Amino acid sequence: MDRLFVSTRKGLFSLVRDGSWWSIERVSFVGDAVSLAMFDARDGSLYAALGLGHFGVKLRRSRDLGASWEELPAPAFPKQPEGAVDTLPDGKPWPWRVEQVWALEPGAGPGEIWCGTVGGGLFRSRDAGGSWQLVRGLWDHPKRKEWFGGGADLPGIHSLSIHPGDPRQVVLGVSCGGAWRSEDGGDTWALSSKGMFAEYMPPQRRDDEAIQDPHRIVRCAAHPERLWAQHHNGVFRSDDGGRSWVSLDARPSVFGFAVAAHPTQPDTAWLVPAVKDDERVPPEARVVVSRTRDAGKTWEVLRRGLPQTHAYDIVYRHALDVDATGQRLAMGSTTGSLWATGDGGDEWTCVSNHLPPIYAVRFVA
């Protein structure tokens, strides 16, 4: 049975598909903000990251698809060295504090999980979330000092992509701090934003790799050298595992937050366009999905089943997902609307208009 987990401002929704229709099976953590959920197919565990305001970031794990939960320690920074001063580029203090879990991905080793956070820390667990270690190779990199917040006060790691054939190769995305790449399993890191550009910076820093704002980076599982990035200033494609990027002319807009890569067809990807910067609404107040099937040379604008009048839904960076077949997609919006398609995006069905604001969606086959 196909299953979809929807993370929202007011809980985690588990949906199941019976034939062509999705229905809500269970709601967990009602009233609590759930930033992400991750299913680990290796042992059937489901993880949920919560943000409880004054009580901080929490992590939960379920062994029965959400019927019951246990608490795990949340990733946390080590104690900041006495007398050490860490500041953002604007001179404000940079506290060693996890403000949100913003990326969760299974690793290659037994019990290995990677976690990116708002706060800028990259963490790794080797015991299925029982404990977490800060990845010092990235945190101690001198270029990390150039990162700054993109929509939040602190920088955040939102995308983690592990090469399926060589888990030593890891690509991640930072808002705002560019794309980064490790080829030794996280021991050392290098900037990997060549080809991206930042129109929000002075001209002399437009191409600076350390201050780029990729909103989301994803990879084609079957052809892992092909990656896609939805950036603040455009859409980019990499053909060399993220080492370099080329700009693409998507329509009706190159701005947005989400991008999804077809799992087996490297030339196919989907975007959810929006208008930057002050408005942040769909172009012409019409919700559409843009799809390319020729590596970004041309784009189809898909709108059947999506609202085309006075629609002000924004789809956040983790709120678009594609399943292992490459045919089923789901996306959720800031207004609590959830849509699904079973034909690659040609036609969409509204699953609900009444959910809380949606942060993330993720399929489980």
Where are these regions (language model features)?
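Extracellular glycan-interacting surfaces
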Residues: 1-365
